[in-house]
């Protein structure tokens, strides 16, 4: 999936990411851009407008939790299916999340990283991260297959 150089670039760059900020924004943008995903978060309170979603404390908190799991997964780039096995089981068997949502969130995460880091998030780094988020989405969807 990733070369040794790509893995090194991904993990080095990730050290600069403020997980709480980026996670909250990524999940918030997912809920705004793809509003049908909100059905999994109805218990989060007011999600009626983009502003409400982006300032919702529960969205920010869960976004941080999502990126904490992503951060842990980056330590296991050679075994993403193993790293995300329990989360795949939870999202498939208990939460019944459409696995397409994992791909959407990964793509939104790449957008948010580009927004936060500008030119520092080079096309090469974007390509590396696209591989990672695709791998994570596939790992999370593994239980569905």
Swiss-Prot record:
Sequence ranges assigned to domain Globin in this UniProt record: 1-145
Keyword annotations from UniProtKB, A to Z: Acetylation, Heme, Iron, Metal-binding, Oxygen transport, Phosphoprotein, S-nitrosylation, Transport
GO cellular component, one term: blood microparticle
Superkingdom as given in the UniProt entry: Eukaryota
InterPro entries for this protein: Globin (IPR000971), Globin-like_sf (IPR009050), Globin/Proto (IPR012292), Hemoglobin_b (IPR002337), Hemoglobin_oxygen_transport (IPR050056)
GO molecular function: haptoglobin binding; heme binding; hemoglobin alpha binding; metal ion binding; organic acid binding; oxygen binding; oxygen carrier activity; peroxidase activity
Residue numbers binding heme b: 62, 91
Positions carrying S-nitrosocysteine: 92
One GO-annotated biological process of the protein: hydrogen peroxide catabolic process
Keyword Ribosomal protein: no
Quaternary state and interactors: Heterotetramer of two alpha chains and two beta chains.
Family note: Belongs to the globin family.
Protein name as annotated: Hemoglobin subunit beta
Organism: Alces alces alces
